[in-house]
C-alpha cells in the first residue's frame, strides 16, 4: 500500500519507511538483489519496479529516514543544515521548473510536516554528519 505524501503527518509517515527499509535499505546492506519503486509525481503513485543498484554506497534523500524506526538501518546519516524557508523556496522553484505546481502542498503539508518532524525527532542531532551550508 502506498501512503500519500500529500497529507499532514508529524512523523512523515507518508514516506512509507517500512517499505523503503525492507525493499531497499536491508537488501542493499546485505548484498541481496531487490527492486525499488520511485514515486511518480505525474500520476501520484509508485512507478514500476526497478532493480536495486548493486553498489558499495547507496544515497537516499529523505528526511523521514531520520525516524527512530529507520535510523538503525542506516550506516551513515547526513543532515544538510539549511533553514526551512530557504529549502522550501528552492524546492518550490525546482518543482515549478519541472512543471509541477505544488506550492499548496509545500505550504499546507510539507513545510508543516518538516517543522513537526524536526521538533519531535531532532534529525540534525541524530545525524552522523552535519553539513552547515
Q: At which residue positions do the language-model features occur?
A:
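Generic structural signal for short, solvent-exposed loop/turn connectors between secondary structure elements
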Residues: 9-12, 64, 68-72, 132-133
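Structural signal for conserved beta-strand scaffold positions within catalytic alpha/beta enzyme cores
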Residues: 3, 79, 131-132
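Small-molecule kinase domains that catalyze NTP-dependent phosphoryl transfer to phosphate-bearing small molecules
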Residues: 45, 67, 96-133
Amino acid at each position: 500500500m502506498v501512503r500519500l505524501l500529500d497529507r499532514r503527518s508529524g512523523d512523515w509517515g507518508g514516506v512509507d519507511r517500512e517499505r523503503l527499509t525492507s525493499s531497499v535499505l536491508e537488501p542493499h546492506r546485505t548484498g541481496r538483489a531487490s527492486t525499488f519503486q520511485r514515486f511518480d509525481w505525474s500520476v501520484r503513485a509508485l512507478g514500476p519496479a526497478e532493480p536495486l543498484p548493486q553498489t558499495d554506497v547507496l544515497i537516499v534523500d529523505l528526511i523521514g529516514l531520520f525516524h527512530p524506526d529507520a535510523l538503525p538501518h542506516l550506516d551513515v546519516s547526513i543532515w544538510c543544515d539549511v533553514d526551512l524557508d530557504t529549502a522550501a523556496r528552492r524546492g518550490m522553484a525546482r518543482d515549478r521548473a519541472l512543471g509541477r505546481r505544488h506550492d499548496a502542498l509545500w505550504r499546507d503539508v510539507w513545510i508543516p510536516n518538516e517543522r513537526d518532524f524536526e521538533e519531535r525527532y531532532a534529525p540534525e542531532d541524530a545525524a552522523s554528519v552535519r553539513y552547515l551550508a
